[in-house]
């Protein structure tokens, strides 16, 4: 079982325990202890389908962005696959910056600079529509 699945399972167990033990001291999952101290955006990235990362979204406070390779057989190398499905380092940076823009931490101009710097084509067809 991968770490993501263990994190989700443990968070579900804690949630269940808290529901059926309302008068006892409520437990906190590892995800909550690790990520919920501050309400900051989380960007979860996987070479698997986006839904794999989305499994932990309900247990993370703050905005949550999942990137994943929702398909296969589209590229000859892992690098090309990540670029095609928009999960390479450039899209990760852009997603993180955009999350900070949405939080009001940085200005939209920073996202525009990232798009320009990394030659991200905003007219590129969405990978899930191809």
Regions picked out by a protein language model, each given a short descriptive name:
Residues 4-130:
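Thiamine diphosphate
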């Amino acid at each position: 079982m991968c770490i993501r699945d263990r994190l989700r399972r443990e968070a579900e167990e804690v949630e269940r325990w808290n529901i059926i033990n309302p008068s006892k001291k409520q437990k906190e999952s590892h995800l909550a202890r690790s990520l919920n101290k501050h309400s900051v955006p989380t960007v979860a990235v996987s070479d698997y389908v986006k839904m794999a990362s989305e499994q932990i979204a309900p247990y993370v406070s703050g905005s949550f962005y999942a990137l994943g390779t929702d398909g296969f057989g589209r590229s000859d190398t892992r690098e090309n696959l990540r670029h095609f499905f928009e999960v390479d380092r450039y899209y990760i940076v852009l997603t993180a910056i955009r999350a900070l823009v949405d939080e009001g931490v940085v200005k939209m101009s920073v996202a525009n600079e990232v798009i320009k710097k990394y030659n991200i084509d905003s007219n590129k067809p969405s990978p899930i529509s191809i």
